[in-house]
A protein has these predicted regions:
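Nucleotide phosphate-binding/pyrophosphate-handling subdomain across enzymes
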Residues: 1-94
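Short hydrophobic/aromatic-enriched beta-strand-loop microsegments
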Residues: 67-69, 92-97, 169-178
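C-terminal helical cap/extension that packs against the catalytic core
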Residues: 41-44, 83-148
Length: 188
């Protein structure tokens, strides 16, 4: 699984850099199906999956769990193929589509994502171009349907939502993401 791979990779990097070995859980935001508490009582999971292979993998990992889908993506060479994994799942009670800002490619317009999901059989698709407002809407829907929220489609979308979460909670993003603070002793 992704968390095991991330842990192995961090151990290899630590060894090569001469860091003392330490037992720790590895969290890679957007890659390890991390839950984050955007709203108390609603399970919100984030995934940076953005291509057919990674979406297939991640959708298999949540098979049998009900969610509201929050989807935002940057432009793809073949959007239909990228979204194909969503045709093979019944996990989602609703979908909210939004924009994903950042990177070298522009966002897929939410109207286009909504059209593509409709062609895959999604009846209830809402459009909310602002990612924060889209997440708030997805959380409200999840409360109505007593299920979770699954955010996917872009590392930029994940980053934007994590940034907003940090801002809302008054957290320090730099501290939260720092593994080895400057000046920290890393050798035994």
């Amino acid at each position: 699984d992704a968390q095991g791979v991330a842990h192995e990779l961090s151990c290899i990097i630590a060894e090569r850099l001469g860091w003392a070995e330490m037992e720790t859980d590895v969290t890679w935001a957007g890659r390890t199906h991390d839950a984050f508490e955007w709203s108390p009582g609603v399970d919100c999971r984030i995934s940076a999956a953005h291509n057919e292979e990674s979406l297939n993998h991640d959708l298999r990992a949540i098979e049998g769990q009900r969610h509201v889908l929050l989807l935002g993506m940057t432009q793809k060479h073949d959007l239909q193929s990228t979204l194909a994994p969503f045709a093979n799942t019944s996990n989602f009670v609703r979908a909210v589509v939004t924009e994903a800002h950042g990177g070298r490619n522009p966002s897929v317009p939410p109207q286009e994502l909504a059209r593509e999901l409709a062609e895959l059989g999604y009846v209830e698709v809402e459009i909310s171009p602002d990612p924060t407002m889209a997440m708030d809407r997805a959380v409200r829907l999840a409360g109505e349907f007593d299920c979770g929220v699954y955010v996917t489609g872009s590392i930029y979308l994940v980053g934007e939502l994590l940034g907003e979460f940090v801002r809302r909670e008054g957290l320090d993003l730099w501290s939260a993401l720092t593994i080895h603070p400057l000046g920290a002793r890393t050798e035994g």
